[in-house]
Amino acid sequence: MHIRFADPGDAAACLAVYAQYIDTSITFETVLPSEAEFSGRIRSYGAVYPWLIAEEDGHVLAYAYAHRAQERAAYGWNAELSVYVRRDAAGRGLGTKLYTVLLALLQKQGVRTAYGVVTMPNDASSALHQKLGFRVLGTYRNTGYKNGRWLDVVWFEKPIGSFTGEPRPLIPIPQLPEAAAILAAANT
């Protein structure tokens, strides 16, 4: 298994993984995005934050990415994380591996807090976040409606940086000097 950064050309492979979830409550999207739209997401998010792929023999098994958690300027040092694993690759620790690399990259970029937003019930995602040191921040009750029922969403939080002093601007992932070394270490 090899971890690398995604590029817009990976949209079809990532979309194939995501398609397995579109009819579930794991995502609140109800219509599968087009390949062009997904490519745009990879390009847009990847301009600032990491979007990672776990692949084996050239096949995408899973992906994880981060994006800005809130719009207002003062929230700029937070990131929301997501991970999607191909169903036939579940149970291999891919989510843990991708999140671990994602968190290391985000910390070097200057992100101070990482968030996971999980529709309940989702035992696998809850276990992943707790295993990696996230704590439950709170529950948005009945915040989404999909597949004939109202759904709760739990927010997980993990501080990954210092909260002393004025923060420096985030380093966009393409400009992060440590990025190659972090990926190399993940692939040894």
Regions found by a protein language model. Name each.
Residues 106-118:
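Conserved GNAT acetyl-CoA-binding A-motif
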Residues 65, 115-118, 130, 135-152, ...:
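Conserved catalytic-core motifs of GNAT/GCN5-like acyltransferases
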Residues 162-188:
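Acidic/histidine-enriched, glycine/proline-rich intrinsically disordered or flexible terminal extensions
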Residues 83-88, 92, 104, 120-121:
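Active-site acidic-Proline motif in GNAT/NAT acetyltransferases
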Residues 91-104, 127-131:
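Conserved acetyl-CoA-binding loop-helix of GNAT-fold acetyltransferases
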Residues 5, 30-88, 99-100, 159-161:
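Acetyl-CoA-dependent GNAT
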Residues 16-32:
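Helix-loop element at the rim of GNAT/NAT acetyltransferase active sites that forms part
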Residues 2-14:
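A short beta-loop-alpha structural element at the N-terminal edge
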